[in-house]
Regions:
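Core dinuclear metal-dependent hydrolase active-site scaffold
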Residues: 1-52, 128-134
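Cap/insert and terminal regions of metallo-dependent hydrolase folds
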Residues: 41-130
Length: 134
């Protein structure tokens, strides 16, 4: 959607049940960041393609693995096990979890264990003021 002076921004449609969803990738000076936004299972293939080889994948982590979150939320969000699968399939270098609910915040160890079943790269939780690159 944008390309100028080495900065390239790419976007593809995600899927968040009946709400609009967009997945973004930003490439600049040999580095890349992909932002999942809120997506459900129907957006996973698009996210995996656009995130391929990203240095950082920022993934919204709003639910726990089934059945530990309200069932209706799984039609809107991606479970930790799937976050790990997508991160591994896209071969991303690092994962940053954002859009954290209170349940997620209270279950960080379980969340990381679930992701680690398929993704072995660094996993970090977003917080106010966090800087990921100098």
């Amino acid at each position: 959607i944008f390309s100028e002076d080495g900065l390239r921004i790419t976007a593809v449609a995600g899927h968040h049940r009946d709400a609009p969803a967009v997945i973004y990738r930003v490439d600049y000076k040999g580095k890349s960041i992909t932002f999942s936004g809120d997506i459900d299972a129907h957006g996973h293939a698009a996210l995996t393609r656009i995130a391929k080889g990203s240095d950082l994948l920022v993934f919204n982590a709003a639910v726990l693995d089934p059945p530990d979150s309200p069932p209706a939320l799984y039609a809107l969000h991606t479970a930790p096990g799937d976050i790990g699968n997508i991160s591994a399939a896209a071969d991303v270098s690092s994962l940053l979890l954002s859009h954290l609910s209170r349940d997620i915040d209270e279950s960080r160890d379980a969340l990381v264990q679930s992701i680690r079943r398929s993704y072995q790269g660094p996993v970090q939780f977003a917080e106010d003021g966090l800087r990921v690159w100098p």
